Amino acid sequence: MARFVMNPVDANLDASIDRFTDALWLEDGLAANTLAAYRRDLTLAARWLADQHQAALLQAQEYQLQAYFAARADTRASSANRRLTVFKRYFRWALREGLITQDPTLKLLPARQPPRVPKTLSEAQVEALLAAPDTDTPLGLRDRTMLELMYASGLRVSELVGLKSIDLGLNEGVLRVLGKGSKERLVPFGELARDWLERWLQDGRAQLLGARQSEALFVTSAGRTPGTAMSRVMFWGLVKRYARQAGIHAPLSPHTLRHAFATHLLNHGADLRAVQLLLGHADISTTTIYTHIARQRLKDLHAQHHPRG
């Protein structure tokens, strides 16, 4: 097996690489850092092919690309798969441009990756996070309601901030949610979330809007266009701020409460397929990742409370 050695990169090694990245910039508007990473991956592969097989990148055969990946077997699966994605895009582009007659990456498969267990919070941590906003103010009331609703329903952040007033069925206790792929689903929420929604609608939203009108359920009070829907970035900033106030120092993500929703349901005996429907997952394998957290919780409880634990 050929041993991979990183040689100095020759920027003029293959003009097709520059043509490809130029096309990506024009057609897809990719960021400069992304284009630089694409160029680096392809140029390193081109150098390796020239050194080991005396072949140009556009002449690469399937077995040669397999050998290239094998030579970098110590690379993490996620990095190898990212690189494979770059190669597949490059050779599809080359085929479309008539530079090659066959795509050598057609049968190359991504490396298997271990499931990434999402970070979540304990039930006590969630309670502390929910209690952090000052609900005596309209902004604090809004924030508490958003946190309560996300934990009660398991919404994605984009779904939460995208809610409109007409999506709320307060009497029925359900939300109409437009999820990934523009798929609509009905999501229930509990009594506590309904109580906070009623308070927000009666006491908070009207104060923030004033004389303005807005379709958004959760509105902002500042910026160039007050009264508009909150952004994902703004909500993420609020989650981090309230986590600090609650003394939570664990790594968080914008979907922390969504992960907690799924994990806590499973911990309390919910059916996996029911959780899949609530989360809006197209494939149950996506939901299965939460069972790893639930099983670990059961192991911890056993170790803590069983006399032979």
Stretches with model-predicted labels:
Residues 1-309:
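Conserved catalytic core of the tyrosine transesterase superfamily
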